[in-house]
Amino acid sequence: PPPPPPPPPPFCHPHAAIRDQPRSRGLGDVYKRQSYECVYKRIDTGKSKIDAWGIFVGKNNPTLLSIHGGPAAQYGFNYFDEFQTYAEAGFNVIACNPRGSSGRGHKFLRDVCGNKWGVNDTHDVVTAFKEMVKEMKISNKNYGIMGGSYGGFMTAWVISHYPKMFKSSVVERALLNWETMVGTSDIGITFPEMYLLEKFDKNINLYRKKSPITYANNIIAPTLIIHSENDYRCPIEQGEQLFSNLKRRGVESAMMRFPAESHELSRSGQPVHRKQRFEAIINWHKKHLT
């Protein structure tokens, strides 16, 4: 009988020419970095119980508060490259799921609608942040705040209502003016009424009352505005309004515009733009917090 066939090579590839080429190092070999562990706590804010997370780098390091979009979204027990990147840059990171977030039932999700918008969620975010700073025993009082979309709204809202609390802010792809969003956003017909519970032409004063741009004159924190030029969800005019206000009043500010990018820049934008975004955020916070 013929001899048995030789065993297959340890690394099989359908194309032998490719198989026999020297294998390049993987990204994991080139970019090995420390992974930072999260601490978790459910915080009683006095009005709700909020899930909060923190990445601790050091008690003498500055701290960033990151606010998710949505608001019907959530942070969870998963690896998030953004937080790891900021930790690697030397920042403690704190995040939470305030009322309005998903994952806690319909009542929790809708507990920011109408006149509750900017009230219940702000209470939860600010209270959770303060409690996590205590929990993590952070002594450095240099705090930065950031967020995108609804998180950008909340960032602008917090720095206009708590103007001395944060020394640095980054407002990304934000909802800043309900009044103009109605006529420019791809969800301008439905989203405002879904959350403000009033029609635009019936209660324009509510739309103005719940817009960060109304309170922009209170902002004193150095603010970086990041926006994509092809953002149809929160059109770039939203960011331009805030930038114009800050520049006009002499508040330290900058606006970074990304051409040919959408609302999804941070998640699916061109790699070069995503890298530039990370660098801009880190450099801005380092400039004002370290």
What are these regions (language model features)?
Residues 14-31:
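Short, small-residue-biased leader/transition segments that mark boundaries at the very start
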Residues 29-33, 198-199:
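Short, conserved catalytic or adaptor-binding loops enriched in Gly and charged residues
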Residues 18-20, 82-83, 203, 212:
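Acidic, amphipathic alpha-helical patches
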Residues 24, 58, 216-219:
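A short, aliphatic-rich alpha-helical micro-motif
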Residues 1-10:
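Long, low-complexity Q/N-rich tracts
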Residues 98-290:
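Active-site-proximal cap/loop segments of hydrolase catalytic domains
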Residues 33-135, 141:
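Cap/lid segment of the alpha/beta-hydrolase catalytic domain
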